[in-house]
Amino acid sequence: MSSEKSSFPEKPPSFEKPSHSNTADHTRSGVHYFFAGWRLISLPGIRRFVILPLLMNIVLMGGAFWWLFTQLNDWIPQIMSHIPSWLQWLSYLIWPLAVLSILLVFSYLFSTIANFIAAPFNGLLAEQLEAKLTGQTLPDSGILSIAKDVPRIMKREVQKLAYYLPRAIVLLLLYFIPGIGQTVAPVLWFLFSAWMLAIQYCDYPFDNHKVGFSTMRQALRRHKVANMQFGALVSLFTLVPFLNLVIMPVAVCGATQLWVDRYRNLSATLPKKSP
């Protein structure tokens, strides 16, 4: 047989399990990466890239949650009125679930809007932090460098919305089913939010390396438990007053550390998106 290489295309990456040399990084939980983000935002040379996402998050999330809390007194009685009579005896349990449901739905909505607006700066933060963590030369961070990436970044954000909206609508419809809407739906929404927030923040370093959106999701599924842990903590801290004002840059930094440990060495083998 000929010794020449086959002309057939190579198989797509299968995201095989990591080698033993990287076992330590691959056994770290999503909890580890979430709390690593709090430390990373204060690294010398990184703080200045945290400021803009932080300020935007304070303005958007602060204003949004202030508005939400002014509406809760009107919304909760309306939700409780939809509870069927045979579940009235559980109203003392369903009431906090109803509050949690509203907070979960709107916190993710507010977070999505804030991330859409701040996406170019979050991408820059991820890029600069990755260079810092890997000892590479810091990339250009000028206005022109940011501006040329804006169309690509905004296109990626639209892809995320296209993935999110159909699934979110189906879950939101569950809230209108008596009984299920006040019990099962909040749990499903929390799990969905955890997955979407993992996608949202882990995507910044993937997109910086021009890894396609579907390929990125496939890679995240290989470590779904850790990514769900990370997303769940981001979701929970988004509900906590004051802490939710700084959660955006923290999550970007934690997700970038996760990329460096688990996915960066695979990036050369991952199919790139078309320009």
Swiss-Prot record:
<keyword id="KW-0813">Transport</keyword>
<keyword id="KW-0812">Transmembrane</keyword>
<dbReference type="GO" id="GO:0000103">
    <property type="term" value="P:sulfate assimilation"/>
</dbReference>
<keyword id="KW-0764">Sulfate transport</keyword>
<dbReference type="InterPro" id="IPR050480">
    <property type="entry name" value="CysZ_sulfate_transptr"/>
</dbReference>
<dbReference type="GO" id="GO:0005886">
    <property type="term" value="C:plasma membrane"/>
</dbReference>
<feature type="transmembrane region" description="Helical">
    <location>
        <begin position="169"/>
        <end position="189"/>
    </location>
</feature>
<protein>
    <recommendedName>
        <fullName>Sulfate transporter CysZ</fullName>
    </recommendedName>
</protein>
<keyword id="KW-0472">Membrane</keyword>
<dbReference type="InterPro" id="IPR022985">
    <property type="entry name" value="Sulfate_CysZ"/>
</dbReference>
<keyword id="KW-0028">Amino-acid biosynthesis</keyword>
<feature type="compositionally biased region" description="Basic and acidic residues">
    <location>
        <begin position="13"/>
        <end position="24"/>
    </location>
</feature>
<comment type="function">
    <text>High affinity, high specificity proton-dependent sulfate transporter, which mediates sulfate uptake. Provides the sulfur source for the cysteine synthesis pathway.</text>
</comment>
<keyword id="KW-1133">Transmembrane helix</keyword>
<feature type="transmembrane region" description="Helical">
    <location>
        <begin position="93"/>
        <end position="113"/>
    </location>
</feature>
<comment type="similarity">
    <text>Belongs to the CysZ family.</text>
</comment>
<keyword id="KW-0198">Cysteine biosynthesis</keyword>
<keyword id="KW-1003">Cell membrane</keyword>
<feature type="transmembrane region" description="Helical">
    <location>
        <begin position="49"/>
        <end position="69"/>
    </location>
</feature>
<feature type="transmembrane region" description="Helical">
    <location>
        <begin position="232"/>
        <end position="252"/>
    </location>
</feature>
<dbReference type="Pfam" id="PF07264">
    <property type="entry name" value="EI24"/>
</dbReference>
<dbReference type="GO" id="GO:0009675">
    <property type="term" value="F:high-affinity sulfate:proton symporter activity"/>
</dbReference>
<feature type="region of interest" description="Disordered">
    <location>
        <begin position="1"/>
        <end position="24"/>
    </location>
</feature>
<keyword id="KW-0997">Cell inner membrane</keyword>
<dbReference type="GO" id="GO:0019344">
    <property type="term" value="P:cysteine biosynthetic process"/>
</dbReference>
